[in-house]
Amino acid sequence: MNYFAVLCIFSCICLWQFSDAAPFISVQSSSQSRSQKVMNGMLRTLYDYSVQDSVNDATGHLIHTHKSNFNSDVMSPEEIERVRQQLNMA
């Protein structure tokens, strides 16, 4: 068998394998919520949070990314940190 025939067979096999690739998947989601209230004549933020999720398979493996943020003018720093930790575990 000559090298040209082997090269043609190899090329056909490679094209056949690469044509069976799975489709690219990308899903993104985000949500945000805020509540404010006037307390002692000042507008205070009771809570302000945002959550972003992203799932894609750009590298061939599903990758899930989760980002969240939380702020409040009326909660103590310890309470804020506890809520942030709970949001990051979700």
Swiss-Prot record:
Task of the protein: This protein is transferred from male to female during mating and may affect egglaying and behavior after mating.
Compartment(s): Secreted, Extracellular space
Tissue-by-tissue expression: Main cells of the accessory glands of males.
Protein name, per record: Accessory gland-specific peptide 26Ab
GO CC terms: extracellular region
Cystine pairings recorded for this chain: none
Major location category of this protein: secreted
Superkingdom of the source species: Eukaryota
Signal peptide, first to last residue: 1-21
BP terms from Gene Ontology: mating behavior; sexual reproduction
UniProt keyword list: Behavior, Secreted, Signal
